[in-house]
Amino acid sequence: MSESEPVHIEYADETELLTEFRNFMSDPDTREKAANYLLNSLIDESILGIVFEVHHAYKTGSVAAIEGQPEDPKSFTIVDMPDMDVFGSTNSKKAIDCSCPNCNRIVAASRFAPHLEKCMGMGRNSSRIASRRIANTRDGGNYFGADEDDEDDADWSGEKRKKKIAPVRTNGSKKNVMKIYFL
């Protein structure tokens, strides 16, 4: 049996393995060989892992993404001046203003979308308002001769029904059952 071949020995139980290990490690020459073998194996595995990672990075082209562009060290200097933050920007809390393309008013950026919606007549109520305007500007009568044919209709824009949730126990059980009542 040569020294380069791996040795495979089967043991009957754990105690036999431990006694054989203790006998093997009691010899200083064997202990030194085992320590050197372990150290060389760890170094080889580490180097091989790094070589494979670098090779894979170059083959896939991800080295350029990892290395990136050289950075300008001046852009990372910390500024210590009054009225400026650490990056050199002024500490202004001025709100950003926008100009409405419809009416040319200056509006705060946080209110620009609601303003534009109302200004252009695109809001959620604008279709109702438009239909009211059309109804008011229409000629005096309609086909049936009545001024308003929807006077007797239910008012769907009125109050909404409120839900009242009441916990109720049924049949003496401990489980709560929720019943919903409409007022």
Curated annotation (Swiss-Prot):
Region described as Disordered: spans on this chain: 140-167
ZnF locations on chain (SGF11-type) = 98-119
Q: Where in the cell is it found?
A: Nucleus
- Cellular component GO terms, alphabetical: DUBm complex; SAGA complex
One short Pfam family name for this protein? Sgf11
Q: Name one GO molecular function term.
A: transcription coactivator activity
Q: Which domain of life is it from?
A: Eukaryota
Coiled-coil residues are: none
| Biological process, per Gene Ontology | chromatin organization; regulation of transcription by RNA polymerase II
Give the keywords, sorted: Activator, Chromatin regulator, Metal-binding, Nucleus, Transcription, Transcription regulation, Zinc, Zinc-finger
Compositional bias (Acidic residues):
146-156
Domain free text:
The long N-terminal helix forms part of the 'assembly lobe' of the SAGA deubiquitination module. The C-terminal SGF11-type zinc-finger domain forms part of the 'catalytic lobe' of the SAGA deubiquitination module.
Entry function: Component of the transcription regulatory histone acetylation (HAT) complex SAGA, a multiprotein complex that activates transcription by remodeling chromatin and mediating histone acetylation and deubiquitination. Within the SAGA complex, participates in a subcomplex that specifically deubiquitinates histone H2B. The SAGA complex is recruited to specific gene promoters by activators, where it is required for transcription.
Q: Which HAMAP family match?
A: Sgf11 (MF_03047)
UniProt family annotation: Belongs to the SGF11 family.
Assembly and partners? Component of some SAGA transcription coactivator-HAT complexes. Within the SAGA complex, participates in a subcomplex of SAGA called the DUB module (deubiquitination module).
Q: What is this protein called?
A: SAGA-associated factor 11 homolog
- The scientific name of the source species is Culex quinquefasciatus (Southern house mosquito)
Q: What is the lineage of its organism?
A: Eukaryota, Metazoa, Ecdysozoa, Arthropoda, Hexapoda
Q: What gene name is given for the protein in this entry?
A: Sgf11
